[in-house]
């Protein structure tokens, strides 16, 4: 997706600076594909190795710190250069901009299938007007009848406010500036951390929507059968005015929807390359995996997403979950020279929130 306007403004029209933020995206996409095995985040240059990119990005980030701080290192030692308050401020300002440059692409990949993301400025709230999904009543009438059943539709207005979220990490200025702690690696881990938490919150909002007592029972299936799933999919599709549906769930949830072995599998035979393929859809309806997310608890090694729910959504209709990001990432920290080991606690602040708000009809299957 295009670079955010705030990043372009932060670069100040400097093409070299803008290339640094584009390079961070390239490095991140390469890492997610080569190390995490997650493709589709975005295109990247595969002619340069990941290790080489990491070193180049670290140096490019330090150059950007020089530009933003207005304090070029020149022939100064790292110790002397790092004493400048401007250098410390610029380091985290650049890190914040790097996070904002990469994060939108990661969100589209992980939650974009069911979440619509919006960006607002600091101090702003997001306002929505939800239009009714129902159609007008068509009735038979005699030749002399002047009016039929009168129907008036009303839109619903909703407001949404972001909530501040924080990450506190300890860094050592000397190690960062001397290359012992890689800035590119630090940014990458920060992006993954924020994206994981946003993924969990967006999914929890979706899960809470169908668990709500007011969610129609006609759109819930307790247990899976092909016939009932087809009926539910047809219902959702019809009430969304023909918008094609898809089945969404974690890999384990989707697995329980695969064809029964006793009924046979779909087999593709070719004289040169015979193969057996897993069915990727049901009657031309797609089956889409929602990537599972770790809870982050290394005592239980739990998973955050429900492995027993499959959601039936119309992909062409309005998305059921809305997300908002307020402003850009901000960081506050104590001074490195307040501690003997030149360490600093840096707290990154990211304001975002999610809400279930849509006129679309959706269903859920418990498997």
Region spans (language model):
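Extended, solvent-exposed, turn-rich assembly/linker loops in the middle of proteins
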Residues: 211-283
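Sequence/fold signature of self-assembling virion shell proteins
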Residues: 54-58, 263-367
């Amino acid at each position: 997706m295009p670079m955010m306007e705030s990043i372009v403004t932060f670069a100040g029209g400097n093409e070299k600076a803008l290339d640094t933020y584009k390079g961070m995206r390239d490095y991140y996409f390469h890492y997610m594909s080569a190390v995490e095995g997650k493709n589709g985040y975005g295109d990247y240059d595969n002619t340069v190795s990941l290790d080489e990119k990491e070193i180049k990005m670290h140096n490019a980030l330090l150059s950007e710190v020089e530009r933003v701080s207005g304090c070029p290192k020149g022939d100064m030692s790292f110790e002397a250069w790092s004493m400048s308050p401007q250098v410390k401020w610029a380091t985290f300002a650049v890190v914040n901009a790097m996070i904002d440059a990469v994060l939108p692409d990661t969100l589209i990949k992980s939650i974009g299938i069911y979440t619509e993301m919006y960006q607002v400025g600091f101090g702003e709230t997001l306002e929505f007007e939800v239009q009714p999904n129902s159609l007008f009543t068509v009735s038979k009438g005699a030749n002399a009848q002047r009016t039929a059943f009168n129907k008036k539709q009303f839109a619903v207005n909703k407001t949404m406010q972001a909530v501040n979220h924080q990450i506190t990490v300890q860094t050592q200025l000397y190690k960062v500036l001397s290359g012992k702690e890689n800035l590119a690696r630090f940014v990458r881990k920060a992006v993954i951390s924020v994206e994981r938490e946003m993924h969990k919150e967006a999914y929890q909002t979706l899960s809470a929507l169908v668990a709500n007592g007011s969610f129609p029972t006609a759109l819930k299936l307790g247990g899976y059968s092909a016939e009932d799933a087809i009926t539910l999919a047809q219902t959702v599709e019809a009430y969304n005015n023909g918008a094609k549906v898809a089945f969404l769930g974690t890999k384990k949830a989707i697995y329980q929807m695969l064809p029964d072995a006793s009924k046979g599998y779909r087999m593709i035979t070719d004289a040169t390359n015979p193969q057996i393929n897993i069915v990727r859809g049901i009657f031309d309806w797609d089956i889409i995996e929602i990537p599972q997310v770790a809870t982050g608890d290394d005592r239980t090694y739990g998973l955050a997403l429900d492995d027993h729910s499959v959601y039936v959504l119309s992909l062409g209709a309005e998305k059921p979950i809305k997300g908002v990001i307020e402003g850009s990432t901000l960081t506050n920290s104590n001074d490195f020279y307040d501690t003997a080991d030149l360490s600093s606690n840096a707290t990154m602040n990211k304001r975002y929130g999610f809400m279930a708000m849509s006129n679309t009809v959706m269903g859920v299957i418990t498997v």
